[in-house]
Amino acid sequence: MSQNLKKKNKSYKETLHTLNIKEDSEKQITLLTEKIKSLQKHFLENKNDLHSRRGLLKKVSRRRKILNYLKRKNKMRYFDLIKKLNLRN
């Protein structure tokens, strides 16, 4: 396993542990948020990378769909997760 992948897995597990996340949909949202943040850093250096931009938009769309599902199923967990991940103002 590459060093970069080990580092990403470690940061993901630490995030799950510190935020006390146990449900699958919340884990998926957290993982997508981590990937979106790393892609945002990538775009600061590579503004014209349109292929990666499409991947970013797909990840944002996927996260939005899972968030909508979570909001429908359990509003309290939805609002807690939004607060923990600082997704809304």
From Swiss-Prot:
SUPFAM superfamilies: S15/NS1 RNA-binding domain (SSF47060). Keywords: Ribonucleoprotein, Ribosomal protein, RNA-binding, rRNA-binding. InterPro entries: Ribosomal_uS15 (IPR000589), Ribosomal_uS15_bac-type (IPR005290), uS15_NS1_RNA-bd_sf (IPR009068). One of its GO terms (cellular component) is cytosolic small ribosomal subunit. The keyword Ribosomal protein applies. GO terms for biological process: translation. It comes from the Bacteria. The keyword Flavoprotein does not apply. One of its GO terms (molecular function) is structural constituent of ribosome. NCBIfam families: S15_bact (TIGR00952). Part of the 30S ribosomal subunit. Forms a bridge to the 50S subunit in the 70S ribosome, contacting the 23S rRNA. One of the primary rRNA binding proteins, it binds directly to 16S rRNA where it helps nucleate assembly of the platform of the 30S subunit by binding and bridging several RNA helices of the 16S rRNA. Belongs to the universal ribosomal protein uS15 family. This is Small ribosomal subunit protein uS15. It comes from Wigglesworthia glossinidia brevipalpis. The gene is rpsO.
